[in-house]
């Protein structure tokens, strides 16, 4: 067996918006909003399991923070930001699985983390997967920060991406 084999879903995972298949209108709309700097506080991606919601959320996070800018998103040789976001280990792009972290304390931890500006990129991004699993109290705790996210000294802001 080959030591460099890769699961097909990972091998063909979209790296830039042009790679996304079946969601061209959504891809173009979000790409244009980022390009024109008309970025909403939050995005909500819905769909059946395996459709690519979390992958698309990472694409948006990369587009917001790529060192090359949204027009020249990294495809082959990834900048530090894009590489870290792709590997899910960027300090300013936080992914939370709301299926396992459903409580108010988990959301309060997010809110506390949002008080500090991004360390190396413009936008701090919170990707909350399975957001529908948050308890009512947890979502209520998140609501104020969602409606009025902090703006940071570097001109950036906090952006939420929800997947359900």
Where are these regions (language model features)?
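P-loop/Walker A NTP-binding region and its immediately flanking N-terminal helices
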Residues: 1-163
